Amino acid sequence: MDSIVTRNVARSKDWLSNQVFPLWFEKGIHAGDGGFVEALSLRGEILDLPRRAMVQARQIYAFRTGMDMGCFPEARTRAVVARAAAFLIERYSAPSGAFFHSIPSASKPGNEQPDLYTQAFALFGLANAYAAAPEASIKRRALALVDYLRRERRAPGGGYTELEDGRFVLRSNPHMHLFEAAIAWLRADEDPRWKELAAEILDLCLTKFVDPETGALCERFAGDWTPERTDGRFVFEPGHHYEWSWLITLHAESRGLDATQVPLRLYRIAEARGVSPGGDAYDEVWSDGVPKKKSSRFWPQGERTKSAARLGAHAPDGEKPGFARSADMALESLSRYLQTPEPGLWRDTLLENGQFREEPVKASSLYHIINAIEEYAALRPGLTSSR
């Protein structure tokens, strides 16, 4: 194995095993109810914030993945995941079959809106809980959520409506996470309803989200699924280009499909237009290639890491070194966000001036970070040297 790769994998796994999971097991789980806390301060203090359903779902995934990577003990993981899944179902469920956005903290109100983004992650969290312990009650709750979406949230032109400020809108990103949830369920359960959901969202992506003229993937849409434009341009996010390219490739692998053209195009657009001269993926870019928001959150760096690694695994031998270089560059970029005074924490946003924004450490972020490390460790050794 390349010495750079060996070092990167060892350093990343050591950080997870000896810094992240000890801290988040001690402080990231509510002592009273077994649910996950929303965030810690940069000093590792628990913050009094409403707790989102998304956090419960993502942390179920993160702890389960930590177990699979050998970074957290199996017995502890199974207990944590089972308790968190029960908490998610008991505290966030609405009579309709939906999940609430958040529950209140000691001093701040929660939010009972059933936004689509929350529904996608609730479905994802339940899939990971089911994979850890396949209980019929978890699957029943997940299918009740799918029934709710199809009964109450269908959009006329396909897909599902999102809620923003009390109004229904159309967005691609929640659908991406529904696709992710369907894939997670397919890996744990062969019920054809998961295959149907995945196929539905993939078709929507290929026919509605990806602009046929530019090849870029739009984020926000009018009611007929036409992109929302400003002066003829729409906004795309390089991080979501990487994320979609990874998900489509992952799904194609598992189902024996041939789907390399769209993922490669999304990836290449992000590489060409969405990465700063310093090697960090931008937050937002106009569809004509002009950067709109030159800040760089941590998660696009993680998505670039795993997209480069997985697409590189399918590339011809002569192209593998390019994917290897991008994976190494992206993981190195991500690693800068993980250098904090208190071990086991992370930064969120690198501003255009090169400084990190001072802000709480969101528990939800670990989902992106550990997924990137897992994919890099599994796939990057199979690519040729990046040197």
Feature annotation, model-predicted:
Residues 1-387:
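Glycan-recognition and catalytic cores of secretory/periplasmic carbohydrate-active enzymes
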